[in-house]
Amino acid sequence: MGIKHLYQLIEEHTPEAVKKGEIKNQFGRKVAIDASMSIYSFLIAVRSDGQQLMSETGETTSHLMGLFYRTMRMVDNGIKPLYVFDGAPPKLKSGELAKRFQRKTEAHAAAEEAKETGTAEDVEKFSRRTVRVTREHNEECQRLLKLMGIPYIVAPTEAEAQCAALARGGKVYAAASEDMDTLTFDTPILLRHLTFSEQRKEPILEIHLDKVLEGLQMERKQFIDLCILLGCDYLDPIKGIGPSTALKLIREHNDLEGVVEHIKSQSSKKLTIPDDWPFADARLLFLEPDVRPADDPECDFKWEAPDVEGLVKFLVEEKHFNEDRVRNGAAKLQKNMKTAQQSRLEGFFKPIEKTAEQKATLKRKADEKLEEKKKKQKVDAKAKKQAKAKPRTAG
């Protein structure tokens, strides 16, 4: 699920933190990809009449089809992907997982009913909600990646946290996930839409955490508290708190301790803290997630030539993929992996850290821009009000 409304809030309050570009802009970069999120997107995207793609023997192949072709597209564009799989979920997440399972069970029943009585849209909507990434899906995807020569790692717990640790440690340029909590786990750069299909024509979003914090004028701990207040996978949300209220509360009360105290002191009781709301535990999971450090021997990743015959055996003989397509894909992969060895020129130069004076100037300019925007909105609103109030003359 990630963090509710976080991207909307970033876009509104700190748009300079987001760069929009094409996949080719990521040429020569190593990227850590949240595998479970990608596999889930392949399972819900590659569907026809509410059914996943299947082999002749009735086995689901959507995840393998998506992984094979999207990974090839990345390598085609000079990217060196590595995939990170979820390990065991933290204990605090068990409540959220139980709720998800309940929703999927209900959705499955609704999907069956929709097949009998509903429209094609109903069938599609409810079928998507029943999709779950299984251990078998993960194991098959890991087998496929090994045959493709693409490295992967299983995280101790959350894949997003491990992706963030690899980006922070300089093993990769960025973490790629649709889950916004990857930013909460402290990835310097988050890429969204990287594994989307070309047909969707969605730009790659490159979100820079330092600019997010600078634009929101927050320290990291405050940002984590904001994310928890917006709604995360570890805790029930506080009903009635949307993105604007969450930002206002953190700015006014500095941290969650202050926010909770303020809410409890209100006589109107418009907002209520859930009985079991261990926000300090959730904060600690973001501050100190269980991850392998970037210098761990298991994080010594190598991109190798694909095992062409192994791919044919697995995808063609076992999963009944088209042999010509698999062989052509493997040949392209082999050729493009050599191209991906080239380094970007920027890799030879370290970015120059901004001075305190430069940061202050940037902040002042951003504040002035915001003030200007507010003034314009006031003038526009006043003009609109006057135009409405102006009496109409009889013709």
From Swiss-Prot:
Q: Where are the transmembrane segments?
A: none
Question: Looking at the record, which segments are called Disordered?
Answer: 359-395
Q: Which PROSITE patterns match?
A: XPG_1 (PS00841), XPG_2 (PS00842)
Family annotation (SUPFAM superfamilies): 5' to 3' exonuclease, C-terminal subdomain, PIN domain-like
- For the ligand (Mg(2+) 2), the binding residues are 179, 181, 233
EC number(s) given by UniProt: 3.1.-.-
Ranges in coiled-coil conformation:
none
Query: Can you tell me which residues bind Mg(2+) 1?
Result: 34, 86, 158, 160
Query: What PTMs does it carry?
Result: Phosphorylated. Phosphorylation upon DNA damage induces relocalization to the nuclear plasma.
Provide the cofactor list for this protein: Mg(2+)
Chief localisation class: nucleus
**InterPro entries, A to Z:** 5-3_exonuclease_C_sf, Flap_endonuc, HhH2, PIN-like_dom_sf, XPG-I_dom, XPG/Rad2, XPG_CS, XPG_DNA_repair_N
The residue ranges flagged as biased composition, category Basic residues, are 384-395
- The segments labelled Interaction with PCNA in the record are 341-349
Ranges where the record places region I-domain: 122-253
> GO:BP terms for this protein?
base-excision repair; DNA replication, removal of RNA primer
One annotated GO molecular function: 5'-flap endonuclease activity
Q: Where is this region: N-domain?
A: 1-104
Enzymatic class:
hydrolase
What the record says about family reads:
Belongs to the XPG/RAD2 endonuclease family. FEN1 subfamily.
Name of this chain's protein: Flap endonuclease 1
The species this protein was found in: Pyrenophora tritici-repentis (strain Pt-1C-BFP) (Wheat tan spot fungus)
In the UniProt record, what gene is named as encoding this protein?
fen1
